[in-house]
């Protein structure tokens, strides 16, 4: 194979099994080819079930696997602080607009249609609770505690 000069994993590394991803990159990159990765990685675990720990690769495991598969880390850049304003704005938007609209809708439906509201609440309450728990994912302080948004440039070593 060895057809490509560059493979770009832009916010997709977390969906690829670590070793399998590096094996495929080895197969498809030309000698001296590059693997450019931009994604968030877990660097701290505290034994909790925080949602930040679920959908990211462990940073050290990822870097160790890269080395083990013959990739040299050429450059790395911690992009975390540059991405936090997006999370902060998302949280602001939900707190300022979405939550008040939902609260008013719930209040109004309970006041005007109590029986219907009770049935609907019973049906969707667990799903809403699950989604509310995911709001920790846009808490920039929680993100900083567990993850780093990293950009890595690897080069396939000539073997």
Indicate where each model-derived feature is located.
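A short acidic, Gly/Pro-enriched loop at the edge of an enzyme's catalytic core
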Residues: 1-7
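Residues lining the SAM
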Residues: 10-13, 38
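Catalytic P-loop NTPase motifs of RecA-like helicase/translocase cores
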Residues: 15-16, 44
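A short glycine-rich, Lys/Arg-flanked "PGG" loop and its adjoining helix->strand segment in the class I
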Residues: 19-34
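Conserved beta-strand signature within the Rossmann-like core of class I S-adenosyl-L-methionine
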Residues: 32-40, 44
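Substrate-binding/catalytic lobe of Class I Rossmann-like enzymes that use SAM or dcSAM, i.e.
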Residues: 49-141
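Short hydrophobic/aromatic beta-strand or adjacent loop that forms the aromatic wall/cage
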Residues: 145-152
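Active-site beta-strand termini and strand-to-loop segments that position acidic
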Residues: 154-157
